[in-house]
């Protein structure tokens, strides 16, 4: 699946990872094999606004912050990579939050 994303889309990739305790989002440049930016519930700006770091509110804040940072870097269009997670719950909330703050995918 990742190879399909790399070959079909020459765009940045928004990778979402959920652990039992935290929510992570990264913008990856697959052409140059580097991570452009990374935001998680461990990021000080996000962590200071949360009391619980593994719920939908946390996912919403991570989506908002990753979209703001991406727009600061001049990144508007991304490919959404949810990994093996279903597009439901925290993944869906993060995606909708990133979309509402200006990312297009």
Curated annotation (Swiss-Prot):
It comes from the Eukaryota. Binds 5S rRNA, forms part of the central protuberance of the 50S subunit. This is Large ribosomal subunit protein uL18c. One of its GO terms (biological process) is translation. One of its GO terms (molecular function) is structural constituent of ribosome. Belongs to the universal ribosomal protein uL18 family. It comes from Cyanidium caldarium. Keywords: Chloroplast, Plastid, Ribonucleoprotein, Ribosomal protein, RNA-binding, rRNA-binding. It holds the Pfam family Ribosomal_L18p. Signal peptide: none annotated. The lineage of its organism: Eukaryota, Rhodophyta, Bangiophyceae, Cyanidiales, Cyanidiaceae.
